[in-house]
Amino acid sequence: MTLAAFATLGALFSAPASAQETQWQKDHPRRTEVNDRVQNQNKRITKEVKEGEISKTQAKTLRANDKTIRGEEKAMASQDKGHITKTDQRALNQQLNQNSQAIGK
């Protein structure tokens, strides 16, 4: 077997593992939970603005908070091979709780 054929064969066998690993990382339950909360908060912010409960300025601040939290989640995941630890999740949830309370005022 030539070196080129061996390299091609190796690439074929490694591709499925990479695809599976990427899918696992993307859909990791802790990441999904945090990101679903961010998405839900953005929907709540939109609803509160429509109902006149919060101003557009307040909404902008709240969305910026959510964007920061999402950025932290991405950074944490990149440090831990595509997932976040329970400690990371706890810290992110505390931040999300604070933002959630501000939405509900």
Set out the residue ranges of the language-model regions:
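Classic N-terminal secretory signal peptides
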Residues: 1-20
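Surface-exposed, polar/charged faces of alpha-helical domains
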Residues: 29-32, 47-90, 94, 98-101, ...
